[in-house]
Amino acid sequence: MNIDIVISADHIDEKRLINKTVIIIDILRATSVITTAINNGCKKVIPVLTVEEAKDIAKNSKEDIILGGERNALKIDGFNFSNSPLEYTKKYVEGKTVVLSTTNGTRAINNSFNAKTILISALINSKATAKAIDKLNEELIIINSGTNGQFSIDDFICSGYLIDCLYNIRKDLELSDIAKTAHYIYTNNKDIESFVKKATHYSRLKSLNLEKDLEYCFQKDIIDVVPQYKDGYIIKSNI
């Protein structure tokens, strides 16, 4: 199995994604939010690029809609929830549709529509994602959402952990140089949160007193669900 990594949403070459399996990672915090919401019974998540698009969907939909997301890590005015996974509890999201717009994660998803299969991953569901990847048995591109178009340490080391989970299932992995680097960094820094504490995005969230979000997002494999983007929205994968 060939595995490569794209370091940010801005670095996505859509033509490269054709007939590939793509994994979207934005552990701080979009893919952690999506995974948590789906695990808590959310009917589906609709990832959108703009605030206006999100509000239009909510206005015109007959479904029970929750608006969630952030800009520069802050809750969007008029939205129900921010980009904190701790807000998307079963009490609030079960049976409902979440329309989500974030600075990095939803942009990475929307830039990946050419892929054959799009799965959503974070630290909280990496082992489950690895099992799904193994079943698909296709060429894999791991897309790090990054931070404002730039490389992000947190997404990169999460990619390394996902590769490590895959190695525990199968040994026939052919890694690109950047994928090898991600795996090496993880295997030498398995206490992920300690490693990324000096990262730009981590520092930004900590400055906003979001330590509980950080603590939650850096847990490994607390959820055995893999969200999948298909036909315009994200649902629980049956892979």
Swiss-Prot record:
Keyword Magnesium: yes
Keywords noted in UniProt: Hydrolase, Magnesium
EC number: 3.1.3.71
Record-linked Gene3D superfamilies: ComB-like (3.90.1560.10)
Substrates-to-products reaction catalysed: (2R)-O-phospho-3-sulfolactate + H2O = (2R)-3-sulfolactate + phosphate
Protein name per its UniProtKB record: Probable 2-phosphosulfolactate phosphatase
Cofactor(s) the record lists: Mg(2+)
Pfam families, sorted: 2-ph_phosp
One of the record's GO molecular function terms: 2-phosphosulfolactate phosphatase activity
NCBIfam families found in the cross-reference section: PRK00886.1-1, PRK00886.1-4
Record has Hydrolase as a keyword: yes
Species of provenance: Clostridium botulinum (strain Langeland / NCTC 10281 / Type F)
Family: Belongs to the ComB family.
